[in-house]
Amino acid sequence: MQRANRGNNKHYYNKFDYWHYGGYKYSFNKKYIYDEKEKDFYSNENNVNNIENVQKSDEKGFTGNPDTWFNDGECFKSKTFKLRNDIIRTSCYHDVILNNHDIFKDKVVLDIGCGTGILSIFAAKAGAKHIFGIESADITEYTREIIKKNNLSDKITIIKGKIEEVELPVEKVDIIISEWMGNFLLYGSKIDKIIYARDKWLNKDGYILPDHGTISIAGIENTDYKNNNEKFWEDVYGVDMSCLKSAIIGKPFVGICPPELINSSSCRILDIDLYTIKNEDLDFSSKYEITFFRDNDKFSGLVAWFDIGFTKLTNKFNLTTNPYHKLTYWYQTIFYTRNDLKVNKGDKVTGSFAVKNPKTNFKQLNIKISFNVANKGKNEKEAWHQFYKFF
């Protein structure tokens, strides 16, 4: 595989240290996609501080003009706005629902975390008898207006409140739909809400969409990023903050992982079925093994991504956040190692990947990863473990 030359493509804007790779623009803590013609826009510190992700290319998965993202109110810079503009995610749900009319026809649907109500509207178009959308955020005022403007007020009822506190005017529902996934599948997810609603309201032969999820990992080489990151903290406007290096390494990095960085096989570490999963099952420990496929390379850490499936439907679908596929709102998650290790084709890393949720809302995850690196044809081994925390 031909490797791109990253070293000749480095630029510095304002207080962020960027490097460019494969058309992507990175900083130590933010990721931006940009067109070279818009350099002035992205070199403006106010824009850089405000924007969380800009992606201009339909080919990569997002649409929308970033110039309209500021001054439109916090609602439209929120998770809801970004999700609506993730055409990979939205088109997947659209196709799942509208290509399974037989499942939705005359059924009662529960949309958990309905946001703007887009999934509820899809369900109505697919022939659902009635849809109840539950949302705890203040956006429900706008959601009801959207439903009204689309002449669906008789089909869709929006209920404001937490899933554990609201009551439905029906005893059971036939289908639960939700965009329940978070970064790394679990962080910030609504999976506990799905479990609660499933146990309380779902009919015995009902459907959960999506109903299946997996997390996979692979090794990466990304020494440039790590080196630039370390240099940044050594001199922050003349202040030595190098003591923060270990803390930064201990926080999972949510961002774009260009597929060229991947240098090993992949391994699945979690496989869940939404029809049977329990909250206690989401604290897990899984063994893994990956094998490197390039010589004279380095091991900088693990990249994780997730896949979800709609497996019980007549027309089945899946959605992936795999680095080899189009980018989604959820990006990928990278767990950097403290040090880079030299690896060659055939070398292996084995270990365990443990995840614990100390809260009940998945707004914090504690992770422990053990690493055992074995060099093929040599008696050299290195073993250690690291702790990471989503918060």
Task: Identify the residue ranges that each predicted region occupies.
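Class I SAM-binding transferase module
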Residues: 2-6, 15-112, 116-354, 358-391
